[in-house]
């Protein structure tokens, strides 16, 4: 979606826009129009003060995806001049949200390193993560960006404007790879859609919200819940041996580097191993592989990836009222 869809009118000379620095709203006089791509170099070489509006306008420059190095230099220059990396436009959108929306991976990484907060919601209660998830079709780049956000402190339980958490939305859209990342980062899989959402999903669990053309996602969520609760009575004959093998492959790919709650993961994996030992669903070799995985990490000191505490603390007290695989198949309503 173009940034201009968020402004009450396109950026033109002399218009006044509201921007937000943290809790403070400041009025900024517009003096720049959208710059063509070949002017980005001249902006960098200019001695003029960089305004917040100019930064937001850069996302509309044609071919900007091929000029991310210069864009990062521009942002760096702006930050050195005192612009807050978490500045918001009149709709509450941040630079990070636009970078995510434009699939500019290097810019997303740069902004996160500069202190961009992935948990700031815009006026529609959308964060960068929820904006990505709400796309009906997502590609590998968007999946990667979602993982980056989670690795850099994006919270798993912030609700969007409808009232859904990220894992609820990802499940409803059938975004299996993002669901996996959310689970690895501690997302609540027992969440029930509130009746207040007044939607098709009202009162439904995650498993009940899975699109009918995503049986593998339904199997993944069922097996995840069985492992967490150590209750495998919910594993019925709709879950195939192939589903179980794929689930095991995913579980074995989880490490302390890509999971915030690896100690819990090992416990759940042990539950799975004990269950499989009583069934003839997989080979003894596979069970042995699970056991070796558990043993190898049980004998070493585990340190979870760092999550910036300020993001979590800020999100809990936030009052912004102005605040992988390519997944190309559209979900069907069950």
Curated annotation (Swiss-Prot):
SMART domains hit by this protein: ANK
Domain of life: Bacteria
Keywords: ANK repeat, Repeat
GO annotation, cellular component aspect: cytoplasm
UniProt xrefs under Pfam families: Ank, Ank_2
ANK repeats: 80-90, 91-120, 124-161, 162-191
PANTHER family named among the record's database cross-references: ANKYRIN REPEAT AND PROTEIN KINASE DOMAIN-CONTAINING PROTEIN, ANKYRIN REPEAT-CONTAINING PROTEIN-RELATED
Descriptive protein name: Putative ankyrin repeat protein RBE_0347
